[in-house]
Amino acid sequence: QKPDSFLMAEIYEEARYREYLQMGKMDALYHKVGLYDTLRDIICYGHSSDRIDFVQEPLRDIAPQMLHFLENHDEQRIASEGFAGEARYGLPAMTLTAHLSEAAVMLYFGQEVGEPAREHAGFAMPTRTSIFDYIGVPAHQGWVNGKRYDGGGLTPEQASLRDFYCRLLRLPIKGNFQNIHRYNREHTSYYNDKVYSFVREEKQRKWIIIVNFSREDTFGFDLQIPPVLR
């Protein structure tokens, strides 16, 4: 009756992803088990960026139907003490998850201004914005600014973060994914598993995306593009 409806499912059994898409007729699935969990482990525990390939490669045929995110109503806020501790530490992962494929990306309200969810709401505990309690979202309220919606209540850091998100999500990045991470791991001096790189290619336009997950270190290397992509 409503052909424009969009059906999204939470399913945490990777072996059943295609079943939900093909038989269940879902339009998209949360990419929680796999990409979100991997990126969280990289951010929080310094796990190897090589793991990204292991979770993405088996899903290439359904990648456009996997919904990417770093925050939602269930998960801890990036800026919370239970996750990264500061919103800026999530920016490399957000850059990657927003443009890794043709998949849609979800931005949870308040994420773009670094909401840390420190409030003791009652039923829910800090680190998550409660969906069970009547509770404010202070960073988001700073953007609302008394219904003026001009960001007048944001700190300079929050305003800068929001500007980053606005610019990131407006980038017209499209096209096929090309993995150059593995090639550089094998052929490039000083390239390591704290960074990740890939190419998005559409007709004559190529986007080269490189992210550095390390909180402390920067790395100098000459990124190489495989001959087949030149």
Can you describe what each PLM-predicted range is?
Residues 50-52, 60-63, 72, 77-230:
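Loop/helix patches that line or flank the sugar-binding groove of alpha-linked glycan CAZymes
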Residues 8-44, 116-126:
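Substrate-binding cleft/loops of secretory-pathway carbohydrate-active enzymes
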Residues 4-8, 65-68, 105-106:
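Structural preference for beta-strand elements that scaffold enzyme active sites
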